[in-house]
């Protein structure tokens, strides 16, 4: 695309709104030391909020997981 073909976007409010709404997806973990359940987002430190232990296990899903045997 050449420079002459580039047009400045006119709807900057919609573009700015998309970047400011970051998804705050949190994952559920279980502490390996004290077995407390906690949720961590992407920017949180990987550390238990109760005891400070650094080993966290990912919690199992509530959905039915079924595999076919051969």
Swiss-Prot record:
Record-linked Pfam families: Zn_ribbon_RPAB4 (PF03604)
The main place the protein resides is nucleus
Cell compartment(s), UniProt: Nucleus, Nucleolus; Peroxisome
| InterPro entries (UniProt xref) | RNAP_P/RPABC4 (IPR006591), RPABC4 (IPR039747), RPABC4/Spt4 (IPR029040)
* Keywords, comma-separated and alphabetical: DNA-directed RNA polymerase, Metal-binding, Nucleus, Peroxisome, Ribosome biogenesis, Transcription, Zinc, Zinc-finger
Keyword field contains tRNA-binding:
no
Query: Which GO MF term does the entry hold, naming one?
Result: DNA binding
Q: Which domain of life is it from?
A: Eukaryota
Keyword Cell division listed: no
What are the coiled-coil residue ranges?
Answer: none
Q: Could you provide one GO biological process annotation from this protein's UniProt record?
A: transcription by RNA polymerase II
What's this chain's function?
DNA-dependent RNA polymerases catalyze the transcription of DNA into RNA using the four ribonucleoside triphosphates as substrates. Common component of RNA polymerases I, II and III which synthesize ribosomal RNA precursors, mRNA precursors and many functional non-coding RNAs, and a small RNAs, such as 5S rRNA and tRNAs, respectively. RNA polymerases are composed of mobile elements that move relative to each other. In Pol II, the core element with the central large cleft comprises RPB3, RBP10, RPB11, RPB12 and regions of RPB1 and RPB2 forming the active center.
What other facts are recorded? Present with 907 molecules/cell in log phase SD medium.
According to the record's subunit comment, the protein's assembly and interactions are: Component of the RNA polymerase I (Pol I), RNA polymerase II (Pol II) and RNA polymerase III (Pol III) complexes. Component of the RNA polymerase I (Pol I) complex consisting of 14 subunits: RPA135, RPA190, RPC40, RPA14, RPB5, RPO26, RPA43, RPB8, RPA12, RPB10, RPC19, RPC10, RPA49 and RPA34. The complex is composed of a horseshoe-shaped core containing ten subunits (RPA135, RPA190, RPB5, RPO26, RPB8, RPB10, RPC10, RPA12, RPC19 and RPC40) where RPA135 and RPA190 form the DNA-binding cleft.
- Which family does the similarity line name? Belongs to the archaeal Rpo12/eukaryotic RPC10 RNA polymerase subunit family.
What's the protein called, per UniProt? DNA-directed RNA polymerases I, II, and III subunit RPABC4
- UniProt organism field: Saccharomyces cerevisiae (strain ATCC 204508 / S288c) (Baker's yeast)
Lineage of the species this protein comes from: Eukaryota, Fungi, Dikarya, Ascomycota, Saccharomycotina
């Amino acid at each position: 695309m050449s420079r002459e073909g580039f047009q400045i976007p006119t709807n900057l409010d919609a573009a700015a709104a998309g970047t400011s709404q970051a998804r705050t997806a949190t994952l559920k973990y279980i502490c390996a030391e004290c077995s407390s359940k906690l949720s961590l987002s992407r920017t949180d430190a990987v550390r238990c909020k109760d005891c400070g232990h650094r080993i966290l296990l990912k919690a199992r899903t509530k959905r039915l997981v079924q595999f076919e045997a051969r």
